[in-house]
Design a protein with these regions (language model features):
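Conserved SAM-binding loop and adjacent beta-strand
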Residues: 17-18, 34-48
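N-terminal auxiliary segments of SAM/dcSAM-dependent transferases
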Residues: 1-20
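Alpha-helix boundary/capping and short turn/kink residues
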Residues: 17-20, 35, 58, 84
C-alpha cells in the first residue's frame, strides 16, 4: 500500500498476521504471471477484509471485481457456516487462475464466480 506513510505501513506489517501459504503463493504468482499485478488487494488490505468478515460473519457477500481471487478468499474465510460469496468479474482470462486458488484455499463450495458482462 504505497499511499500510507512508511511508518504506518511498517507498523501494520509488524503487527499483522503473516500471509498463509495459499495467499502467499497467489500473491507471488499474480506478480509473476498476470498483467497489472498492482490490482491485487494484497496482504494488509486482505487482512482488513478478513477481519471485518470474521467480525460480522455474513451469510452472503457480493464482491464486484474478482481479479485473481485474493480478496474473495479473505472475505470468504469469515462467512457463516453454509454462507456464500458471489464474486463477479468481466475478465474471462483470469477465471481459471482465480478458481484454482479458491480451490487451494478450500473455499470452492462457498465461493461462486460469475464471469462476463
Amino acid at each position: 500500500m504505497d499511499f500510507l506513510p512508511k511508518e504506518i505501513n511498517d507498523y501494520c506489517a509488524l503487527y499483522t498476521q503473516k500471509e498463509d501459504d495459499v495467499l502467499y503463493q497467489l500473491h507471488r504468482e499474480t506478480n509473476q504471471k498476470i498483467l497489472r499485478p498492482r490490482m491485487l488487494s494484497g496482504h494488509l488490505q486482505g487482512q482488513l477484509l478478513s477481519f471485518f468478515s470474521k467480525m460480522i460473519q455474513p451469510d452472503k457477500i457480493l464482491e464486484i471485481g474478482t481479479y485473481t481471487g485474493y480478496s474473495a478468499i479473505c472475505l470468504a474465510r469469515g462467512l457463516k457456516k453454509g454462507g456464500e460469496l458471489h464474486t463477479i468479474d468481466i475478465n474471462e482470462e483470469l477465471e481459471d487462475f482465480a478458481c484454482s486458488f479458491i480451490q487451494k484455499a478450500g473455499l470452492k463450495d462457498c465461493v461462486k464466480m460469475h464471469v462476463g458482462d
